[in-house]
Swiss-Prot record:
Gene3D superfamilies on file: 2.40.50.40
Cross-referenced SUPFAM superfamilies: Interleukin 8-like chemokines
Triggers of expression: Generated during an inflammatory reaction.
Pfam families: IL8
Family: Belongs to the intercrine alpha (chemokine CxC) family.
Function: Has chemotactic activity for neutrophils.
Protein name: Permeability factor 2
InterPro entries: Chemokine_b/g/d, Chemokine_CXC, Chemokine_IL8-like_dom, CXC_Chemokine_domain, Interleukin_8-like_sf
GO cellular component: extracellular space
């Protein structure tokens, strides 16, 4: 399968509660996309793009980094 070189997050979703998020995946800027992308995997299995500058996203990432759980 051919993957397109473009941003995965065309729009971001607001108002997802932390308790509904199973995991956050952070994609750094690169040739495929000029911006940092944050993709939340919800407990329902859905994926939703979040704004990397959103306070909740920053808090979640800081908590994860301080736990020493890097992935």
């Amino acid at each position: 399968a051919l993957t397109e070189l473009r941003c995965q997050c065309l729009q971001t979703v607001q108002g997802i509660h932390l308790k509904n998020i199973q995991n956050l995946k952070v994609l750094s800027p690169g040739p495929h996309c000029a911006q940092t992308e944050v993709i939340a995997t919800l407990k329902s299995g859905q994926e939703a793009c979040r704004n990397p500058a959103a306070p909740m996203v920053k808090k979640f990432l800081q908590k994860r980094l301080s736990n020493g759980n890097s992935s």
